[in-house]
Amino acid sequence: MTVIHDLPDADYHTRPELSSTGARLLLPEFGGSPAKFKYRQGREYTSAAFDVGKAVHAAVLGVGAEAVAYPEDVLASNGAASTKAAKEWADSVRFEGKIPMKAADLRPITGMSEAVLRHPTARALFELPGHREVSVFSEVDGVKVRARFDALTDETPQGVFGIDLKTTSDSADGDTFTKTVVKYGYHVQEQWYRETLGQDIRFAFVVVESTAPYLVAVHELGLAYKDMGKTLAKVARDLYAECEATNTWPGHPEDVQVLEPPVWAAMAHEERYALSSEIRI
């Protein structure tokens, strides 16, 4: 196992080892497939939400890609970043490892980062002795894997913590975030990080809402999530190894698929129309 502190973001993401993001991209549970994984491999990916997340990380952790505002003189008269000058400036900023944003878009970044640091539990976690942006490389089940902790603490009386900062456009409350965990496979990420590190550490998600008042919550996942994540991480590694060995990266099935309604839809139909029949009688 190799542990590297302060590895530049670009250097980490161009490494060939399988990451938890790649693992989830392989799995149909998260809308993935080997074909989608192969297509994305080696391609740079960015989005407005991705940029916001990276900028908040940098503001809270003090490391990573800093967000910088477009100069007014490169913007169009309506304020759009659509001019040739704006695009060239943005390209140069990204080349420097920074994130171009309009000045108005920087205010929520400040709001979110300040909200995280005001939250007593979140702040206490980030102030524990340890390191920020810790990159770990190892081998699990014969597959070379990697993980990048936002923060990894030293041993504390409560144990070693891996900490992951998430921004969300939904609520950060537990009832909502548990659905987000299932949707995006954060339980797979958590277990992937544990297995890559080779330690059964505690893992905390610090979640901040992306709209004012930028509410914050801190969550740990329970044992059922741990078991589910462990199973899916294993499935992803095995699938990756098989695809690599055969150089075959399948997408959707090629034959005709006969579909049946989901259980919830069938039950809703049955309840509605069974009730209608009773009323008519």
Regions found by a protein language model. Name each.
Residues 137-139, 152-154, 206-208:
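A generic structural motif
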